[in-house]
Amino acid sequence: MQILLANAKMMTAASDTAPLTEPGFQTIADTLALEMAAMDTEELERQLDCSKKLAAENWGRYQNFFTAAKIPAILAYNGQAYKHLRAQSLTTEDLEFAQKHLWITCFLYGLLRPMDGIVPYRMEHCATLQSTHNRPINQFWKDKLTDFLI
């Protein structure tokens, strides 16, 4: 059995948990992050459909994307599903099970396992980038993830 869980917009900044695994689509995430890092805050505000304050925060995140400390995906997100999951309280055995059976979908990394190391980010489904051939990011990932999961 495999479980898919969507990401959350709210993220946690740090964690001491290790060891981390590498996301399967890390190379694509790096390419997308580089393109986002090249944008100014006004363009980020438009692409992320967010406030100036959130655009500025995420501009900083993308500037530090390659140097920021990585945290396990299961601990990085802070939305309702993750609060109820209480990942901080999972045992090593629970995390090993989750690593084999849980996938987290997101618009930057595509598909994550719980212990994949990621950095805080924001990416919206409607963002259109040159890297995605000017298609909305959700359409870009749809083809890749469908092929991967089926």
Spans of model-derived segments:
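Active-site helix-to-loop segments that bind/position phosphate- or nucleotide-bearing substrates
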Residues: 2-89
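Internal, well-folded beta-alpha domain core
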Residues: 87-150
